[in-house]
């Protein structure tokens, strides 16, 4: 049995949605195009069952943004529904090309700014999506795994998941 046959016999967990954060919009568009092409051309037969709702689509990308206020603070905003979806969020925390203004001054986004935006989008999606998965090429704040002095363990402070709705990072 080929891998495609296994894939054809596997039921989707939920309708697929993809969020490409501003730091990796181009990559997110390429992933979206590949998934659209794959689902249109490779999978031969999709059942008319309610389990396959929105299986084939022209676009899996979710329109979202993290607008900034004049002070540099931001908020996560989802511009379409993600209720009941299998949500994948893509981000690149090492992208230093993005900028925003604080009190009229141009500021480059740091890895911490990208990570905060990721947490804002996760917060906006929590309780609505069936599953939330994060695709992040560089696991930010993971370098420190034990304490040697009075110092923080930043990654260990992240408790995002609810018992019934896991979030994979």
Residue ranges: model-predicted function:
Residues 138-140:
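Active-site-proximal loop/turn and secondary-structure-junction residues that shape catalytic pockets
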Residues 48-98, 115-119:
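Active-site-flanking structural segment that lines cofactor/substrate pockets
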Residues 158-169:
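Single conserved hydrophobic/aromatic residue that forms the stacking wall/gate
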Residues 62-72, 103-126, 148-157:
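Glycine-rich anion/phosphate-binding loops
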Residues 97-98, 142-146:
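A short acidic, helix-capping loop that chelates divalent metal ions and anchors anionic groups
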Residues 24-31:
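Short N-terminal binding/cap micro-motifs at the start of the first secondary-structure element
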Residues 11-22, 87-90:
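Short hydrophobic beta-strand segments
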């Amino acid at each position: 049995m080929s891998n495609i046959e296994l894939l054809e016999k596997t039921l989707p967990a939920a309708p697929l949605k993809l969020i490409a954060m501003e730091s990796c919009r181009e990559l997110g568009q390429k992933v979206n195009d590949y998934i659209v092409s794959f689902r249109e051309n490779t999978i031969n037969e999709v059942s008319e069952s309610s389990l396959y709702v929105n299986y084939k689509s022209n676009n899996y990308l979710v329109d979202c943004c993290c607008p900034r206020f004049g002070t540099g603070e931001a908020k996560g905003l989802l511009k379409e529904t993600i209720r009941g979806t299998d949500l994948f969020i893509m981000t690149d925390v090492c992208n230093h090309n993005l900028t925003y203004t604080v009190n009229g001054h141009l500021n480059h986004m740091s890895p911490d700014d990208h990570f905060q935006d990721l947490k804002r989008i996760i917060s906006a999606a929590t309780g609505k999506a069936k599953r939330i998965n994060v695709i992040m090429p560089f696991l930010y704040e993971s370098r420190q795994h034990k304490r040697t002095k009075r110092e923080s363990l930043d990654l260990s402070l992240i408790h995002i998941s609810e018992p019934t709705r896991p979030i994979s990072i």
